[in-house]
UniProtKB/Swiss-Prot annotation:
Pathway: Lipid metabolism; fatty acid biosynthesis. This is Acyl carrier protein. The lineage of its organism: Bacteria, Bacillati, Actinomycetota, Actinomycetes, Pseudonocardiales. GO terms for biological process: lipid A biosynthetic process. Carrier of the growing fatty acid chain in fatty acid biosynthesis. Belongs to the acyl carrier protein (ACP) family. PROSITE patterns: CARRIER (PS50075), PHOSPHOPANTETHEINE (PS00012). One of its GO terms (molecular function) is acyl binding. The keyword Nucleotide-binding does not apply. Keywords: Cytoplasm, Fatty acid biosynthesis, Fatty acid metabolism, Lipid biosynthesis, Lipid metabolism, Phosphopantetheine, Phosphoprotein. It is found in: Cytoplasm. Residues 4-79 form the Carrier domain. It holds the Pfam family PP-binding. 4'-phosphopantetheine is transferred from CoA to a specific serine of apo-ACP by AcpS. This modification is essential for activity because fatty acids are bound in thioester linkage to the sulfhydryl of the prosthetic group. The gene is acpP.
Length: 95
């Protein structure tokens, strides 16, 4: 997943979850102030992203998550860690 795909997925989940137009969702949008999310909404968003990426988010990783951009950075980090773990699990190609 690249940055654009991650944003589109977050945008889709938030629009469905919150019942708001996708156009209202930007990287700069504050989850609470601009989008009206509460802590339960954040848990549901993270759960959907965990399912999408296939990795779990630690509670400590949620600290400081205030904007859609922060959610994107967290998701990009998870995708990168998953790719690194997958590469480490693959046996080296025979020479």
């Amino acid at each position: 997943m690249d940055r654009k795909e991650i944003f589109e997925r977050i945008e889709q989940v938030l629009a469905e979850q919150l019942g708001i137009p996708a156009e209202q969702i930007t990287e700069e949008a504050d989850l609470r102030e601009d989008l009206g999310m509460d802590s339960l909404d954040l848990v549901e968003l993270v759960s959907a992203l965990e399912d999408e990426v296939g990795m779990r988010v630690e509670q400590s990783q949620l600290e400081g998550i205030e904007t859609v951009g922060h959610v994107m950075e967290l998701t990009l980090d998870l995708v990168a860690r998953l790719a690194t773990a997958s590469a480490a699990d693959k046996p080296e190609a025979a020479s």
